[in-house]
Regions:
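Alpha-helical transmembrane segments of multi-pass membrane proteins
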Residues: 16, 85-86, 146-147
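Hydrophobic transmembrane-helix microenvironments that flank and shape a buried ionizable site
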Residues: 12, 74-77, 130, 139-141
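Alpha-helical multi-pass transmembrane bundles of energy-transducing inner-membrane proteins
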Residues: 117-120, 124-169
């Protein structure tokens, strides 16, 4: 197994650790950490995409001792890497484009929570694209919907708050 084949797992693990670390950071450090995570995940995913284009093959990365129906497994191929590259580019441009507006509309004491929710949304998208088993897909669909609802409610006024609360009910 080549080292680049470990990058999808590293993307998931790095993003999860970054989301946890952002909870104790200042808003400025959390923003920088989130931007670093997006760029690092994008770079690792592009490396995996180049690898899958060169080999023309897909591979399964088994996490643990059991294969897909009973254990967690990641499947990586050309389709997965291309679609995740598009997702990560959209996340990068959205985060950079909305940075000034989010700084104005979100309280400074809650900006690190915004970064945590962005990290969790990105984490769930990475895991959903790469997963090869239903249990992992279900878990990360739940993480994705809760993080997305939290991102909608971060503005804390108007229709966004009502929509987020309705979803949570």
């Amino acid at each position: 197994m080549q080292f680049v084949q470990n990058f999808p797992f590293f993307c998931i693990l790095l993003t999860l650790m970054g989301a946890v670390a952002s909870s104790v950071m200042s808003s400025r450090m959390a923003r920088r950490t989130t931007l670093f995570l997006i760029l690092a995940d994008l770079a690792m995913n592009v490396s995996v995409m180049i690898y899958t284009f060169q080999t023309g093959d897909s591979y399964a990365y088994k996490m643990g001792h059991f294969p897909a129906p009973w254990g967690n497994e990641i499947r990586v191929g050309v389709l997965e890497t291309v679609s995740l590259t598009v997702f990560l580019l959209v996340i990068l441009f959205s985060f950079l484009g909305g940075m000034r507006r989010s700084e104005k509309e979100i309280e400074p004491t809650k900006y690190n929570i915004y970064c945590i929710l962005t990290d969790l949304t990105m984490l769930s998208l990475i895991a959903l694209v790469y997963t090869n088993d239903l249990f992992t897909a279900y878990v990360f669909i739940e993480i994705n919907t809760l993080a997305a609802a939290g991102l909608v409610m971060m503005r804390q006024h108007g229709r966004a708050l009502v929509a987020g609360v309705r979803y949570m009910m």
